[in-house]
Regions:
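Short amphipathic alpha-helical surface micro-motifs
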Residues: 1-3, 54
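Short, Lys/Arg-enriched anionic-surface-contact patches
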Residues: 3-25, 73
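Long, charge-rich, low-complexity alpha-helical segments
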Residues: 25-77
Length: 77
């Protein structure tokens, strides 16, 4: 999945946050919904997205996870 084909960031739209191209749907909103257990189909219906948009959001997050290390505090669940 080449997420660059479906995701863009424009300072004039949603404060420059990553969004699905041609929309104001932020990638973080898609990921928040999926992380909360919302089925991909429900996210697609709720935000008028295509499956490829949701897949691009996940691929974008995967790339970020490979690039960014978030320190974990021992003993904190």
């Amino acid at each position: 999945m080449n997420w660059q084909e479906r995701i863009t960031a424009d300072p004039a739209i949603c404060h420059g946050r990553a969004c699905i191209k041609g929309t104001r749907v932020m990638v973080s909103v898609i990921l928040d919904n999926l992380a909360a257990g919302e089925p991909a189909e429900a996210v697609m219906r709720g935000y008028h997205l295509q499956r490829e948009d949701v897949e691009a959001a996940v691929a974008y997050a995967a790339d970020l996870a490979r690039e960014t290390v978030i320190p974990f505090i021992p003993g904190v669940a």
